[in-house]
Protein backbone atom coordinates (compact mmCIF):
# COMPACT_ATOMS: atom_id res chain seq x y z
CA UNK A 1 0.00 0.00 0.00
CA UNK A 2 1.49 3.27 -1.08
CA UNK A 3 0.52 6.23 1.09
CA UNK A 4 2.39 9.35 2.23
CA UNK A 5 3.52 8.90 5.84
CA UNK A 6 3.52 11.65 8.46
CA UNK A 7 6.90 10.44 9.68
CA UNK A 8 8.44 11.44 6.31
CA UNK A 9 7.07 15.00 6.25
CA UNK A 10 8.53 18.32 7.41
CA UNK A 11 5.85 19.72 9.73
CA UNK A 12 7.76 22.72 11.13
CA UNK A 13 5.42 25.72 11.37
CA UNK A 14 2.69 23.88 9.48
CA UNK A 15 -0.95 23.64 10.54
CA UNK A 16 -1.48 19.92 11.06
CA UNK A 17 -4.89 18.31 11.60
CA UNK A 18 -4.88 14.76 12.97
CA UNK A 19 -8.02 12.61 12.83
CA UNK A 20 -7.47 10.26 15.76
CA UNK A 21 -9.62 7.67 17.48
CA UNK A 22 -10.24 9.16 20.92
CA UNK A 23 -13.63 7.46 21.29
CA UNK A 24 -13.07 6.37 24.89
CA UNK A 25 -15.51 5.48 27.67
CA UNK A 26 -16.24 8.41 30.01
CA UNK A 27 -17.97 8.34 33.40
CA UNK A 28 -18.66 11.40 35.57
CA UNK A 29 -16.42 13.51 33.33
CA UNK A 30 -13.42 11.17 33.65
CA UNK A 31 -11.89 8.82 31.07
CA UNK A 32 -12.36 5.26 32.38
CA UNK A 33 -10.27 3.38 29.78
CA UNK A 34 -7.39 5.24 28.16
CA UNK A 35 -6.09 2.60 25.69
CA UNK A 36 -7.02 4.57 22.56
CA UNK A 37 -5.55 7.83 23.87
CA UNK A 38 -2.34 6.06 24.92
CA UNK A 39 -2.09 4.59 21.39
CA UNK A 40 -2.38 8.12 19.93
CA UNK A 41 0.16 9.81 22.24
CA UNK A 42 3.25 8.92 20.12
CA UNK A 43 1.62 10.58 17.08
CA UNK A 44 0.85 13.74 19.09
CA UNK A 45 4.35 13.88 20.57
CA UNK A 46 6.05 13.32 17.20
CA UNK A 47 4.02 16.08 15.50
CA UNK A 48 4.84 18.50 18.34
CA UNK A 49 8.54 17.56 18.20
CA UNK A 50 8.46 18.31 14.46
CA UNK A 51 7.24 21.83 15.29
CA UNK A 52 3.65 21.46 14.08
CA UNK A 53 0.81 23.80 14.91
CA UNK A 54 -1.24 20.84 16.01
CA UNK A 55 -4.98 20.22 15.93
CA UNK A 56 -6.60 16.88 16.67
CA UNK A 57 -10.19 15.72 16.39
CA UNK A 58 -12.23 12.57 16.93
CA UNK A 59 -15.75 11.36 17.42
CA UNK A 60 -16.91 10.29 20.88
CA UNK A 61 -20.10 8.27 21.28
CA UNK A 62 -23.16 8.74 19.10
CA UNK A 63 -24.54 12.24 19.56
CA UNK A 64 -27.30 13.69 17.39
CA UNK A 65 -25.40 15.13 14.44
CA UNK A 66 -25.31 18.91 14.22
CA UNK A 67 -26.12 19.42 17.91
CA UNK A 68 -23.73 20.16 20.78
CA UNK A 69 -24.22 17.74 23.69
CA UNK A 70 -22.01 18.07 26.76
CA UNK A 71 -22.35 14.32 27.43
CA UNK A 72 -20.31 13.61 24.28
CA UNK A 73 -17.79 16.43 24.64
CA UNK A 74 -14.06 15.73 24.24
CA UNK A 75 -13.37 17.82 27.38
CA UNK A 76 -12.53 14.73 29.52
CA UNK A 77 -9.99 13.75 26.82
CA UNK A 78 -8.51 17.28 26.93
CA UNK A 79 -8.17 17.07 30.73
CA UNK A 80 -6.48 13.68 30.37
CA UNK A 81 -4.04 15.03 27.76
CA UNK A 82 -3.17 18.02 29.97
CA UNK A 83 -1.85 15.53 32.56
CA UNK A 84 0.16 13.56 30.00
CA UNK A 85 1.70 16.32 27.87
CA UNK A 86 4.05 19.15 28.74
CA UNK A 87 2.60 21.50 26.11
CA UNK A 88 -0.48 23.74 26.31
CA UNK A 89 -3.69 21.83 25.49
CA UNK A 90 -7.07 23.47 24.91
CA UNK A 91 -10.48 22.60 23.52
CA UNK A 92 -11.96 24.53 20.57
CA UNK A 93 -15.76 24.35 20.29
CA UNK A 94 -16.41 26.54 17.24
CA UNK A 95 -13.60 25.96 14.80
CA UNK A 96 -15.03 25.43 11.31
CA UNK A 97 -14.36 29.03 10.27
CA UNK A 98 -10.75 28.86 11.48
CA UNK A 99 -8.77 28.43 14.67
CA UNK A 100 -5.54 30.07 15.88
CA UNK A 101 -2.85 27.56 16.82
CA UNK A 102 0.70 28.29 17.93
CA UNK A 103 3.67 26.02 17.15
CA UNK A 104 4.12 23.53 19.99
CA UNK A 105 0.50 23.90 21.10
CA UNK A 106 -2.23 21.24 20.89
CA UNK A 107 -5.78 22.30 20.13
CA UNK A 108 -8.42 19.59 20.43
CA UNK A 109 -11.29 20.28 18.02
CA UNK A 110 -14.60 19.33 19.62
CA UNK A 111 -16.38 16.07 18.70
CA UNK A 112 -16.54 15.97 14.90
CA UNK A 113 -19.98 14.36 15.07
CA UNK A 114 -21.35 17.68 16.41
CA UNK A 115 -20.82 18.99 12.85
CA UNK A 116 -23.71 18.71 10.41
CA UNK A 117 -22.70 16.68 7.36
CA UNK A 118 -20.01 14.61 9.14
CA UNK A 119 -21.58 11.20 8.54
CA UNK A 120 -22.89 12.00 5.06
CA UNK A 121 -19.47 13.45 4.17
CA UNK A 122 -20.84 16.65 2.63
CA UNK A 123 -18.42 18.55 0.40
CA UNK A 124 -19.11 21.79 2.28
CA UNK A 125 -17.97 20.32 5.62
CA UNK A 126 -15.02 18.46 4.06
CA UNK A 127 -13.72 21.72 2.54
CA UNK A 128 -14.06 23.51 5.89
CA UNK A 129 -11.97 20.81 7.60
CA UNK A 130 -9.41 20.98 4.79
CA UNK A 131 -9.13 24.79 5.06
CA UNK A 132 -8.02 24.43 8.69
CA UNK A 133 -4.76 22.70 7.80
CA UNK A 134 -1.69 22.47 5.58
CA UNK A 135 -1.36 18.75 6.33
CA UNK A 136 -4.15 16.29 7.15
CA UNK A 137 -3.10 13.17 9.07
CA UNK A 138 -5.45 10.18 9.14
CA UNK A 139 -4.52 8.13 12.20
CA UNK A 140 -7.82 6.48 13.18
CA UNK A 141 -7.70 2.96 11.76
CA UNK A 142 -10.84 2.08 13.72
CA UNK A 143 -12.89 4.44 11.52
CA UNK A 144 -11.03 3.86 8.23
CA UNK A 145 -13.93 1.76 6.90
CA UNK A 146 -16.24 4.79 7.09
CA UNK A 147 -16.25 7.47 4.38
CA UNK A 148 -17.10 10.44 6.61
CA UNK A 149 -16.19 14.12 6.55
CA UNK A 150 -13.30 13.83 9.01
CA UNK A 151 -11.95 10.53 7.65
CA UNK A 152 -12.43 10.79 3.88
CA UNK A 153 -13.76 14.17 2.72
CA UNK A 154 -11.02 16.23 4.36
CA UNK A 155 -8.38 13.98 2.73
CA UNK A 156 -9.81 14.83 -0.70
CA UNK A 157 -9.32 18.57 -0.26
CA UNK A 158 -6.44 19.10 2.21
CA UNK A 159 -3.20 20.37 0.57
CA UNK A 160 -1.43 17.19 1.80
CA UNK A 161 -3.11 14.02 3.11
CA UNK A 162 -1.05 11.34 4.84
CA UNK A 163 -1.18 8.36 7.20
CA UNK A 164 -0.19 8.81 10.83
CA UNK A 165 2.16 6.36 12.58
CA UNK A 166 -0.70 4.36 14.11
CA UNK A 167 -2.53 3.89 10.80
CA UNK A 168 0.71 3.21 8.90
CA UNK A 169 1.74 0.59 11.48
CA UNK A 170 -1.66 -1.07 11.25
CA UNK A 171 -1.53 -1.22 7.44
CA UNK A 172 2.03 -2.60 7.50
CA UNK A 173 1.07 -5.33 10.00
CA UNK A 174 -2.12 -6.30 8.16
CA UNK A 175 -0.25 -6.30 4.85
CA UNK A 176 2.42 -8.58 6.33
CA UNK A 177 -0.25 -11.01 7.59
CA UNK A 178 -2.72 -10.88 4.70
CA UNK A 179 -0.92 -9.81 1.53
CA UNK A 180 2.51 -11.43 1.89
CA UNK A 181 2.26 -13.96 4.73
CA UNK A 182 5.26 -16.10 5.58
CA UNK A 183 4.05 -19.69 5.43
CA UNK A 184 2.57 -21.74 6.92
CA UNK A 185 -0.14 -19.22 7.78
CA UNK A 186 -2.73 -20.11 10.41
CA UNK A 187 -5.94 -18.11 10.86
CA UNK A 188 -8.02 -18.57 14.02
CA UNK A 189 -11.60 -17.35 13.74
CA UNK A 190 -13.87 -17.53 16.77
CA UNK A 191 -17.09 -15.85 17.73
CA UNK A 192 -20.69 -16.84 18.07
CA UNK A 193 -22.03 -17.01 14.52
CA UNK A 194 -20.86 -18.23 11.12
CA UNK A 195 -23.23 -15.71 9.50
CA UNK A 196 -21.40 -12.68 10.96
CA UNK A 197 -17.97 -14.07 10.00
CA UNK A 198 -18.87 -15.78 6.72
CA UNK A 199 -17.02 -13.34 4.44
CA UNK A 200 -14.03 -13.45 6.83
CA UNK A 201 -13.99 -17.26 6.70
CA UNK A 202 -14.33 -17.30 2.90
CA UNK A 203 -11.57 -14.73 2.46
CA UNK A 204 -9.19 -16.48 4.87
CA UNK A 205 -9.91 -19.89 3.35
CA UNK A 206 -8.19 -18.61 0.19
CA UNK A 207 -5.12 -17.29 2.06
CA UNK A 208 -4.53 -19.47 5.13
CA UNK A 209 -2.79 -22.84 5.03
CA UNK A 210 -4.82 -23.83 8.07
CA UNK A 211 -8.12 -22.29 9.19
CA UNK A 212 -9.06 -22.88 12.83
CA UNK A 213 -12.65 -22.23 13.91
CA UNK A 214 -13.82 -21.80 17.50
CA UNK A 215 -16.69 -20.61 19.64
CA UNK A 216 -20.25 -20.89 18.33
CA UNK A 217 -18.82 -20.99 14.79
CA UNK A 218 -17.15 -24.34 15.58
CA UNK A 219 -20.52 -25.81 16.65
CA UNK A 220 -21.87 -25.33 13.13
CA UNK A 221 -18.79 -27.16 11.76
CA UNK A 222 -19.21 -29.94 14.37
CA UNK A 223 -22.83 -30.36 13.24
CA UNK A 224 -21.66 -30.32 9.61
CA UNK A 225 -19.37 -33.26 10.45
CA UNK A 226 -22.47 -35.22 11.54
CA UNK A 227 -22.24 -34.82 15.33
CA UNK A 228 -24.94 -33.88 17.81
CA UNK A 229 -24.47 -30.37 19.25
CA UNK A 230 -27.42 -30.57 21.68
CA UNK A 231 -28.76 -27.15 22.68
CA UNK A 232 -25.55 -25.37 21.62
CA UNK A 233 -25.55 -22.17 19.61
CA UNK A 234 -25.53 -23.53 16.05
CA UNK A 235 -26.70 -22.19 12.70
CA UNK A 236 -28.30 -25.27 11.15
CA UNK A 237 -29.21 -23.31 8.01
CA UNK A 238 -25.47 -22.80 7.33
CA UNK A 239 -24.41 -26.43 7.69
CA UNK A 240 -24.05 -26.81 3.90
CA UNK A 241 -21.86 -23.67 3.83
CA UNK A 242 -19.72 -25.13 6.63
CA UNK A 243 -19.42 -28.43 4.73
CA UNK A 244 -18.29 -26.56 1.60
CA UNK A 245 -15.67 -24.54 3.53
CA UNK A 246 -14.44 -27.66 5.33
CA UNK A 247 -14.07 -29.46 1.98
CA UNK A 248 -12.12 -26.58 0.40
CA UNK A 249 -9.89 -25.68 3.35
CA UNK A 250 -7.79 -27.47 5.92
CA UNK A 251 -10.04 -26.99 8.99
CA UNK A 252 -9.19 -29.30 11.91
CA UNK A 253 -12.33 -30.91 13.33
CA UNK A 254 -12.81 -30.62 17.09
CA UNK A 255 -12.46 -34.05 18.75
CA UNK A 256 -13.46 -33.15 22.31
CA UNK A 257 -15.50 -30.37 23.88
CA UNK A 258 -16.40 -28.85 27.24
CA UNK A 259 -20.14 -28.77 27.87
CA UNK A 260 -22.59 -27.37 30.42
CA UNK A 261 -26.34 -27.61 30.88
CA UNK A 262 -27.04 -23.86 30.86
CA UNK A 263 -25.33 -20.58 29.99
CA UNK A 264 -24.31 -19.35 33.44
CA UNK A 265 -21.19 -18.59 35.43
CA UNK A 266 -22.02 -21.37 37.90
CA UNK A 267 -22.93 -24.20 35.51
CA UNK A 268 -20.56 -27.18 36.00
CA UNK A 269 -18.21 -28.02 33.11
CA UNK A 270 -17.86 -31.56 31.72
CA UNK A 271 -15.27 -32.70 29.16
CA UNK A 272 -16.73 -35.03 26.51
CA UNK A 273 -15.72 -36.62 23.24
CA UNK A 274 -17.48 -34.81 20.39
CA UNK A 275 -19.44 -38.02 19.70
CA UNK A 276 -20.83 -38.15 23.28
CA UNK A 277 -22.70 -34.82 23.27
CA UNK A 278 -26.32 -35.32 24.37
CA UNK A 279 -29.49 -33.43 23.45
CA UNK A 280 -29.46 -31.32 26.63
CA UNK A 281 -25.75 -30.35 26.41
CA UNK A 282 -24.43 -26.93 25.43
CA UNK A 283 -20.89 -26.73 24.01
CA UNK A 284 -19.00 -23.81 25.57
CA UNK A 285 -15.33 -24.62 24.84
CA UNK A 286 -12.98 -26.94 22.99
CA UNK A 287 -11.62 -29.86 25.02
CA UNK A 288 -7.99 -30.36 26.13
CA UNK A 289 -7.08 -32.75 23.27
CA UNK A 290 -8.40 -30.33 20.63
CA UNK A 291 -6.71 -27.39 22.37
CA UNK A 292 -3.36 -29.23 22.39
CA UNK A 293 -3.71 -30.15 18.70
CA UNK A 294 -4.43 -26.51 17.83
CA UNK A 295 -1.53 -25.31 20.00
CA UNK A 296 0.80 -27.64 18.03
CA UNK A 297 -0.49 -26.17 14.73
CA UNK A 298 0.12 -22.65 16.08
CA UNK A 299 3.64 -23.50 17.26
CA UNK A 300 4.55 -24.62 13.71
CA UNK A 301 3.12 -21.52 12.01
CA UNK A 302 5.14 -18.63 10.56
CA UNK A 303 2.17 -16.21 10.41
CA UNK A 304 -0.85 -16.17 12.76
CA UNK A 305 -4.01 -14.11 12.44
CA UNK A 306 -6.34 -14.31 15.46
CA UNK A 307 -9.90 -13.01 15.51
CA UNK A 308 -12.23 -14.33 18.19
CA UNK A 309 -12.01 -16.62 21.24
CA UNK A 310 -12.59 -20.39 20.91
CA UNK A 311 -14.88 -20.65 23.96
CA UNK A 312 -16.89 -18.71 26.53
CA UNK A 313 -13.66 -17.49 28.16
CA UNK A 314 -15.54 -15.00 30.37
CA UNK A 315 -16.57 -18.02 32.52
CA UNK A 316 -13.41 -19.56 34.00
CA UNK A 317 -14.61 -23.17 33.63
CA UNK A 318 -14.89 -22.61 29.86
CA UNK A 319 -11.76 -20.47 29.42
CA UNK A 320 -9.08 -23.15 29.15
CA UNK A 321 -9.30 -23.59 25.37
CA UNK A 322 -8.86 -19.87 24.68
CA UNK A 323 -6.08 -19.69 27.30
CA UNK A 324 -4.13 -22.54 25.66
CA UNK A 325 -4.54 -20.92 22.21
CA UNK A 326 -3.50 -17.50 23.61
CA UNK A 327 -0.41 -18.93 25.32
CA UNK A 328 0.59 -20.86 22.18
CA UNK A 329 0.38 -17.62 20.16
CA UNK A 330 2.46 -15.88 22.86
CA UNK A 331 5.14 -18.60 22.76
CA UNK A 332 5.18 -19.02 18.97
CA UNK A 333 8.08 -17.36 17.10
CA UNK A 334 5.62 -16.54 14.27
CA UNK A 335 4.50 -13.04 13.29
CA UNK A 336 1.10 -12.71 15.00
CA UNK A 337 -1.67 -10.16 14.59
CA UNK A 338 -4.83 -10.10 16.70
CA UNK A 339 -7.96 -7.98 16.39
CA UNK A 340 -11.56 -7.67 17.50
CA UNK A 341 -13.04 -6.64 20.85
CA UNK A 342 -13.46 -10.13 22.36
CA UNK A 343 -9.97 -11.09 21.22
CA UNK A 344 -8.48 -8.05 22.97
CA UNK A 345 -10.41 -8.92 26.15
CA UNK A 346 -8.96 -12.46 26.00
CA UNK A 347 -5.44 -11.06 25.46
CA UNK A 348 -5.91 -8.89 28.56
CA UNK A 349 -7.32 -11.75 30.64
CA UNK A 350 -4.39 -14.04 29.87
CA UNK A 351 -1.75 -11.29 30.02
CA UNK A 352 -0.11 -11.85 26.63
CA UNK A 353 -0.35 -8.32 25.14
CA UNK A 354 3.44 -7.91 24.98
CA UNK A 355 3.84 -11.31 23.27
CA UNK A 356 1.56 -10.65 20.28
CA UNK A 357 3.49 -9.04 17.39
CA UNK A 358 0.68 -6.61 16.56
CA UNK A 359 -2.66 -5.90 18.22
CA UNK A 360 -5.09 -4.17 15.87
CA UNK A 361 -6.95 -1.13 17.20
CA UNK A 362 -9.85 -1.41 14.74
CA UNK A 363 -12.80 -3.76 15.20
CA UNK A 364 -14.97 -3.25 12.11
CA UNK A 365 -12.07 -1.90 10.02
CA UNK A 366 -9.90 -4.91 10.94
CA UNK A 367 -12.65 -7.33 9.85
CA UNK A 368 -13.34 -5.44 6.62
CA UNK A 369 -9.62 -5.50 5.71
CA UNK A 370 -9.52 -9.24 6.44
CA UNK A 371 -12.64 -9.68 4.28
CA UNK A 372 -10.69 -8.10 1.43
CA UNK A 373 -12.81 -4.95 1.32
CA UNK A 374 -11.40 -1.56 0.38
CA UNK A 375 -11.19 0.83 3.35
CA UNK A 376 -12.37 4.23 1.99
CA UNK A 377 -10.14 6.34 4.26
CA UNK A 378 -7.08 4.35 3.12
CA UNK A 379 -8.12 4.38 -0.55
CA UNK A 380 -8.27 8.20 -0.61
CA UNK A 381 -4.77 8.41 0.95
CA UNK A 382 -3.47 6.08 -1.78
CA UNK A 383 -5.17 8.22 -4.42
CA UNK A 384 -3.63 11.41 -3.01
CA UNK A 385 -0.19 9.78 -2.83
CA UNK A 386 -0.37 8.99 -6.57
CA UNK A 387 -1.29 12.58 -7.39
Curated annotation (Swiss-Prot):
BP GO annotations: gluconeogenesis; glycolytic process
Disulphides: none
Which Gene3D superfamilies does UniProt cross-reference here? Answer: Phosphoglycerate kinase, N-terminal domain
Report the EC code(s) recorded for this entry: 2.7.2.3
Q: Is Cytoplasm set as a keyword in this record?
A: yes
Where is this gene product found? Cytoplasm
Q: Which reaction does it catalyse?
A: (2R)-3-phosphoglycerate + ATP = (2R)-3-phospho-glyceroyl phosphate + ADP
Give binding positions for ATP.
197, 314, 340-343
- Binding locations of substrate: 21-23, 36, 59-62, 113, 146
Q: Could you tell me which PROSITE patterns the record lists for this protein?
A: PGLYCERATE_KINASE
* Keywords tagged on the record: ATP-binding, Cytoplasm, Glycolysis, Kinase, Nucleotide-binding, Transferase
* Keyword Cytoplasm belongs to the record: yes
Note the subunit structure: Monomer.
Give the family, as the similarity comment puts it.
Belongs to the phosphoglycerate kinase family.
* HAMAP family listed in its UniProt record: Phosphoglyc_kinase
Q: What is the designated name of this protein?
A: Phosphoglycerate kinase
Q: What is the lineage of its organism?
A: Bacteria, Pseudomonadati, Pseudomonadota, Gammaproteobacteria, Aeromonadales
Amino acid sequence: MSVIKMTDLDLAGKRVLVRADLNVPVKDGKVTSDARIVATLPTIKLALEKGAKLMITSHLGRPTEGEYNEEFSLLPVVNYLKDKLSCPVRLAKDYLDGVEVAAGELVVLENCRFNKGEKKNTEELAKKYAALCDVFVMDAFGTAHRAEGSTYGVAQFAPVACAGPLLAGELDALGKAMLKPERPMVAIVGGSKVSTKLTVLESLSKIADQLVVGGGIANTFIAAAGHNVGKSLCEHDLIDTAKKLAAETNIPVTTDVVVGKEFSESTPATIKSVSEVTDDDMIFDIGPDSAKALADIIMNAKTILWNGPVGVFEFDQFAKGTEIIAKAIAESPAFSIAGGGDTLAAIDKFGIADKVSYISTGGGAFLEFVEGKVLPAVAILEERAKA
